[in-house]
Amino acid sequence: MKVTTRNPWLWIPTLYFAEGIPYFIVNNISVLMLAKMGVPNGMMGLFTSLLYLPWMIKPFWSPFVDIIRTKRWWIIAMQLLMSLAFIMLTLCMPHPSVAEIASRNTPIGIFDVTLILFAITAFASATHDIAADGFYMLALSTKNQAAFVGIRSTFYRLSSIFGQGVLVYIAGYTETHGLGFLGIEAGDIPASWQLTLGVTALIFSLVTLYHTFIVPRPATDHPRLDTNHRKAGAGAIFHEFANSFATFFTK
């Protein structure tokens, strides 16, 4: 692996901005979108609450992120997976009828693919959180870790403003006024959310492309299994997993 270093200002702001976007898409935008599409609260409540589960249970698989591959690999791989999920969410957006939306009785079954893609995004995002936070500790000196803690927090909050403010505004404006140059008429709720997810997919894909080249490759970023252990196969992996799991719960 070629070791590279980068000015932290080049990648920390965008890394933590990217960390927040999928979290707010899955836990906030999904609920608002389904409600606007006319899905009854009782039907969507269970499914959308389950989408938060990956962040609750991520300690159970975080040891695998330490054991297998580098933190950088996990960051880029999960961002690529989430970019693909956002693209698929845009392309597979269901379009319930105006009557279904108005009746507030849109069947949640037509959103099966959408919910699966949100679930994939949730697991990828939780895994990305593990890798990004670990990478932050590896790639920066103790001094820089302290210096940039406010920066990472600020850009995570900016992603909240983007996810819960800018994207919601785009959907609301498009629904109210339409966008004639895109063929979206006023009142077309499904198209307004399709556009919103399309904007998300575009921005997140560009950030992912940027990170592919800019995120550094520090010498300290390596799997816990060295080459000899990796040749030992699954036994060594699960041995390391057990050690990591035990360490986590004894802290």
Give residue spans per PLM region.
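Intracellular loop-helix junctions on the cytosolic face of multi-pass helical membrane proteins
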Residues: 1-6, 99-115, 127, 139-251
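C-terminal ends and interior cores of transmembrane alpha-helices
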Residues: 75-108
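Interfacial helix-cap and linker-helix signal at transmembrane-aqueous boundaries
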Residues: 34-35, 65-69, 97, 170-175
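Central cavity-lining transmembrane alpha-helices of secondary-active solute carriers
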Residues: 44-67, 80, 164
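Intracellular juxtamembrane helix-capping segments at the cytosolic ends
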Residues: 30, 123-141
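Helix-loop boundary and gating motifs at the non-cytosolic
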Residues: 1-55
